[in-house]
Amino acid sequence: DSLALAAIAAHFARRGDVRVGAIIVDHGLQEDSAAVAAQTAQTLTDLGLHPVITEKVQVPVGNMGPEMAARTARYTAFTKAVEATGARAVLLGHTLDDQAETVLLGLSRGSGTRSLAGMPPVRVEGGVTYLRPFLGLRRTDMLDICDAENLTPWIDPTNTDETLMRARIRHSVLPYLEEHLGGDVARSLARTASVAGPDAEYLD
């Protein structure tokens, strides 16, 4: 998803509409993570993004669990990169499918209205503006973009590790719901998020 986002952003950067760089966050959770980060940095440089920053982070799990610990470390790296470059916003490659998973995760934790709202397309956190331009697109659309640009995305092994809640929702729960309820459950969940978003924002 992030590689497809980089390709689209690079397209607009080449037109001179915006200046776009990239940050690669190496969580160090796989043995070859440094090599993957280096290869990704080269790919993004070849696309014309500048600067391309690689940030190695520590992921201390503690009491928050591996997924939340990785997210916390990642967003800390984003903040550091914004401060170093003066970037006006951070683009994130979350898709409609990610949104559906986030809604289900929130519901499973009893997060109330905020869980139904999922991820907002625009959010300011820690003084940094985050934009999610692909919340209306499917994960398959991201793969199509990569194919069209002759890019080979790296598939994070944790995305298929069903000991992690999000991967379990992606590969087991959502397919089960769609099989037994019928219809496009992921799209329905994402639509619910878009409707509930303004309410959650108001309540906040």
Where are these regions (language model features)?
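Core alpha/beta nucleotide-donor-binding catalytic domains of modification enzymes
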Residues: 1-175
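ATP/NTP-dependent adenylation/nucleotidyl-transfer catalytic domains that generate, transfer
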Residues: 164-204
